[in-house]
Amino acid sequence: MNVSAIIVEYNPMHNGHLYHIKKTKELTNCDALVCIMSGNFVQRGFPSILDKWTKANMAISNGVDLVIELPTLYSLSSAEFFSFGAVSTLDSLNIINSICFGSEIGNINALQDIATTLLEEPLEYKILLKNYLDKGISFAKARNLALVELNRDNKIMSENINKILSLSNNILGIEYLKSLLLLNSSIKPFTITREGADYKDENLHKEYSSASSIRKYLKENKNINILKDFLPLEGFLEFKRLITKGYNFSMEDSMINYIRYKYISGYKNLHNLIDVSEGLDNRIYKSLEKNFTYDSLVGEIKSKRYAYSRIGRILCQYFIGFENYDLNSLLKSTPNYMRVLASNEAGLKVLKKIKKHSSTNIYTKVPKNTNTLLNLDIKATNAYSLLNNNIRFNEDYFRSPIIIKNTIY
């Protein structure tokens, strides 16, 4: 059985994601497609616009065979740890033959070369990186500049590196490849050229629009018929239903109110979060005293050194309560379980194969004794339930995987 995998967030699922599913199947010729998906919080530093079960259901309805949850610890981490959490989980299953991701360059060899350099970290690269970081430049930009300078004698390579590392999906793809190399994984990587608008583009475009533009439109408009051209049918109908129910499409703004209350109640322990360097905690506290929306708060805090998404992840972590955990130890470990969110009949066959070939614990229901990673997922859902009225407190304990039978693609 040839099993391929994709790493996704679906915030929300749109036509570009359908293209990714279709091209993955064509490129890998797989018999089954597994996706590991961020749950109720996503890597850009937002609460997910739809809950994880609704997203999983849409994925199965649109060509995925098995959906498993990426632990919240990883979904709210940097690209490096996000990728490692996803890839190490997939690798531990011992049945995944390939992984396919979208990138702007669409060239797996170019991405592999950069990934190898970043993993091996030659001394000159380390020195260059430190010099740029000492100037107050963000890690991502400092890394780009160091790599360009490392290849300064090769003009073509230097120009290509700068172009590759300026685009978000290339960067994430490199992190996937680094994780595969680090794990000495047998999973074969593939990439497809990403179609459509950049994820930061907030304008709707014909056929392929970014998730950001769709979220923005949902926040600002009640008539969503225009979105029918950009979403799978299930997604369009779900959003149409939610609008009639007065759904909260601005959950990040609601989250800020809870965060402000936590701060004024005396919980000043942001410094325990690993992404919070010295002084950043006080910068956030001061901003919380005068900003009432997510965009205004993050906009005031962000700087050359502190990227928008990094601040967003810190706020989500603080909202959930990450500061009470030993995050350094957790991030250095590999997940020892997989949480099933949804499946079809082909996915059930994949699960049987996993049980036969892997020692990874498969959870279809929350066990009595939860490990720390799973406990964080439960806390994340409980925090999310404060923002999304469709989700109950302790929803993780009530939900079983969604099983859809007789889906054919």
From Swiss-Prot:
Disulfide bonds: none annotated. Keywords: ATP-binding, Cytoplasm, Ligase, Nucleotide-binding, RNA-binding, tRNA processing, tRNA-binding. It is found in: Cytoplasm. GO terms for biological process: tRNA modification. It comes from the Bacteria. It is an enzyme of class 6 (ligase). One of its GO terms (cellular component) is cytoplasm. Its EC number is 6.3.4.-. One of its GO terms (molecular function) is ATP binding. Belongs to the TmcAL family. HAMAP family: TmcAL. Catalyzes the formation of N(4)-acetylcytidine (ac(4)C) at the wobble position of elongator tRNA(Met), using acetate and ATP as substrates. First activates an acetate ion to form acetyladenylate (Ac-AMP) and then transfers the acetyl group to tRNA to form ac(4)C34. The keyword Nucleotide-binding applies. The keyword Hydrolase does not apply. This is tRNA(Met) cytidine acetate ligase. ATP binds at residues 7-20, 102, 169, 194. It catalyses: cytidine(34) in elongator tRNA(Met) + acetate + ATP = N(4)-acetylcytidine(34) in elongator tRNA(Met) + AMP + diphosphate.
